[in-house]
Amino acid sequence: MRVGITLACSECKQRNYMTTRDKKKQNEKIEKKKYCRFCNTHTLHKEIK
């Protein structure tokens, strides 16, 4: 079952990206390095509820 998640910037805490993931196959939280328009740089984005 795929569920929607939000990715937030680890530096400024802005919620920049929405994506989905499969809860059965992936138990750990997602962390991706993506562009943050508020920080104006690439930062680590972590999954939040």
Swiss-Prot record:
User: From which source organism is this entry?
Assistant: Syntrophomonas wolfei subsp. wolfei (strain DSM 2245B / Goettingen)
Q: Which InterPro entries match?
A: Ribosomal_bL33 (IPR001705), Ribosomal_bL33_sf (IPR038584), Ribosomal_zn-bd (IPR011332)
- Entry protein name: Large ribosomal subunit protein bL33
Q: Which domain of life is it from?
A: Bacteria
Q: Name one GO biological process term.
A: translation
**Which keywords, in A-to-Z order, does the entry hold?**
Ribonucleoprotein, Ribosomal protein
Q: Which Pfam families match?
A: Ribosomal_L33
Family statement drawn from the similarity comment of this UniProt entry: Belongs to the bacterial ribosomal protein bL33 family.
GO MF terms on file?
structural constituent of ribosome
> Which PANTHER family does the record match to this protein?
50S RIBOSOMAL PROTEIN L33, CHLOROPLASTIC, LARGE RIBOSOMAL SUBUNIT PROTEIN BL33C
Gene Ontology terms: cellular component: cytoplasm; ribonucleoprotein complex; ribosome
